[in-house]
Amino acid sequence: VEELGAKYYDNGVQGDIFDILKNYGVNSVRLRLWNDPYTEDGVPYGAGTNDLEVYKKLAKRAMDHGMSILLDYHYSDFWADPGKQRVPKAWRGMDADQLEQAVYDYTRETLLEMKDAGVLPQLVQVGNELTNGLMWPLGQKPEYDNIAKFVSAGIRAVRSVGSDIPVMIHLDNGGNNPMYVDWFDHYMERGENFDIIGMSYYPFWHGTMKELEANMRDMADRYGKKIVIAEVSMGFTMEDYADYEKLGPDDRKGYATKPSLVENLDYPMTPEGQAEFMNDIMKLIDDVPGGDGFYYW
């Protein structure tokens, strides 16, 4: 965003984003890592081009401001989420055993390079929103043997570099308790131990706050893990942003959420509603045993 000329302001005063965040008590940032976010001709895919070099620059800025880092391995060259988990270009054609080794080697090598650069993360999540698996099709749900194999390879690699670095496994849809129980029951039978269950929670998609709370409590009690809301946000307006986007009608992607979904929210899409929602999220984390923090996304 900064490379495109964006500037950050606090009450009308321009400032460095990390200065502003620190002044408001932010103590940790979540940085994603893509394997090779470029075309075969070397053209960046965009969206921040979050390769290892970008990670090191951002992590240094955050750490210089006293913040910890949650490193988010996607194990993909671009976005990985429940709707897509593409194998990195360099790993295409590998079988499950080869992918397992590739995950281990890549995770270990990148962490060692981060360590040498003085930007080793304080927390690592092995995969991003793994609800439907990772590195499809071999690691696509319901291939739980391979899912556990790939995730466990990443966990072992983290432990080999920093045995005290907590490891997170992150799913989406934080209000869906049956899905979490099913996923983690399968994983626990097969996979390496880990430390934290990460959840995504967007209120227009992922159920009510009460459903989120019930799931957090059950996960902490059932599996004995800390709980982090790894992604959470709430809008403050339904105003059309066409004037800011400056794209033609055929190029616009539209709202992040639909007006019909907003109608069912317990909070209005206003600055006051956004603040109330986030205050309730923070209170929930404080109240739930094992609640350990959140990352606004």
Regions found by a protein language model. Name each.
Residues 1-57, 61-68, 76-102, 198, ...:
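N-terminal substrate-binding region of glycoside hydrolase catalytic domains
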Residues 2-13, 37-53, 131-134, 172-181, ...:
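Acidic-and-aromatic substrate-binding clefts and catalytic sites of carbohydrate-active enzymes
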Residues 4-23, 55, 103-113, 177-189, ...:
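Short, acidic/polar
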Residues 50-54, 80-194, 207-216:
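Active-site cleft segment of glycoside hydrolase catalytic domains centered on the general acid/base Glu
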Residues 189-199, 208-254, 293:
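Aromatic-lined glycan-binding groove of carbohydrate-active enzymes
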Residues 204, 226-238, 249-297:
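Substrate-binding cleft of secreted/luminal carbohydrate-active enzymes
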